[in-house]
Amino acid sequence: MKRLVERPVKRQTLTAAGAAALLLLPLTACGGSAEAGDGSTVTVTVGYQSKTINTVTAGTLLRSLGYFEKQLGALGDGVTYKVDWQDYATGAPITAQMTAGKIDIGSMGDFPLLINAARGKQLGKPTHLVSVTGYNLRGGLNTIVTAPDSELASLEDLKGKKVSTSVGSAADGTLVRALQRAGVDPVDGIEKLNQQPAVGASALSAGSADALSQFVAWPGLLAFQGKAKALYDGAQLDLPTFHGVTAREDFAKKRPAVLEAFLKAQAQATAYLDEHPVAAAESVAKATGLPAEVVYLYNGAHGISTFDPTVKPRLVAALEEDVSVLKAAKLTGDIDVDAFVDDRYVKRALGASYAERLTATPPPAASEVWPKGATETRTFTTPADLLAHVAGHNDGIRAAYVPDATTGTLWFADRAVWVADGENLLPFVAPATARAYVDAHGGARVVTYADALELAS
């Protein structure tokens, strides 16, 4: 058995999705919710997406920790604050409520953020991106999956097939770009089904959709449940994707201290997640009903998502590139991304640490095992080391995670595509990347997970 490094894993970042198609709904009301009350009591309304777990530091986890309420209580301005947390399935209704003046602060994915900007400008109710929750610099938060027994093995195989996605979401953007690179027309080359994630997942299981392109946490959830397998790793695009926090401009101007209190609380929640990744995963799982193993895949110490409130230039640049995809789909017109981004509040909230955090990059993903009954995971030098441990402790393993050999995207070890190359055992999220590696390395071959375990033991 190869050497095992047994030490608690801790995300190596500085301590401090979801999106769906947006229907341009009519304005239903006016007046900010943060202006409610009798003069001494103010209600702040926060819209979030509990199951879009890339936003937990501005939603599910933040709410459970109570940090925002504590920050508001520490303002000492003689005002009694109440927080109204409103949970939504996608970013679209959050945007609708923000432009109606009913939500003050919201969180959503990159493509819905752009629609949030466009909708706010259209209605004269501008909003601004004020912080980031979680991101992946290569695009690994979005994945295209097929049914477990599907014979589809590449993007080219999707020609003429029914593909479910949520139009206007980051997952839709991944689908469009991936198909374009593969030489498949994203409009006429497939039959696109515009569906909410849960509906698309059901369609995939029922056989009425041949593939599903979705955002965190749906691909990982379906793979974990044995209801899907990965066809395309969004990180193959090598384009950043992220989720962020948006605030109404009038709210930010009227109550800047409240917005800064929220961003300070978000930074605290980020620090908690970094320092207690397993506990955070368990907490989010309890609140959402998602398996903790799936939450950890995305939000864990070496998860697919890196959490950091700073608004990094690379993410802003990616947002600018996303505009063309939305315009081509006739979901928006031109969007002034520079005008939409307003990082002054998060700069004040983070203080001197902001500049250092802004340039920080995530560490490479690592192989991890989550032992049953453990409150910490263990990290391994190589995927082969992890396999050797799993082979000897299979009954004691809650979950095992390995990074894709080419993209770094973390995936479940028993759901990965494995390649044997000499003494090396290499995991891949999708079959196409595994085949590409085999084609470029003489003697390398695809093996089953069972064979990989045997080779490692």
Go through the PLM ranges and name each one.
Residues 37-186, 191-195, 210, 239:
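Short, glycine-/small- and polar/acidic-enriched structural segments
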Residues 192, 198-286, 384, 391-400, ...:
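Pocket-lining segment of extracytoplasmic ligand-binding domains
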Residues 327-363:
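Conserved C-terminal helix/tail region of periplasmic/extracytoplasmic solute-binding proteins
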Residues 25-29:
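C-terminal motif of bacterial Sec signal peptides marking the signal peptidase cleavage site
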Residues 53, 255-333:
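Secondary-structure end/capping motifs
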Residues 141-151, 241-257, 419-421:
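A bilobed periplasmic-binding-protein/Venus flytrap-type ligand-binding module shared by bacterial periplasmic
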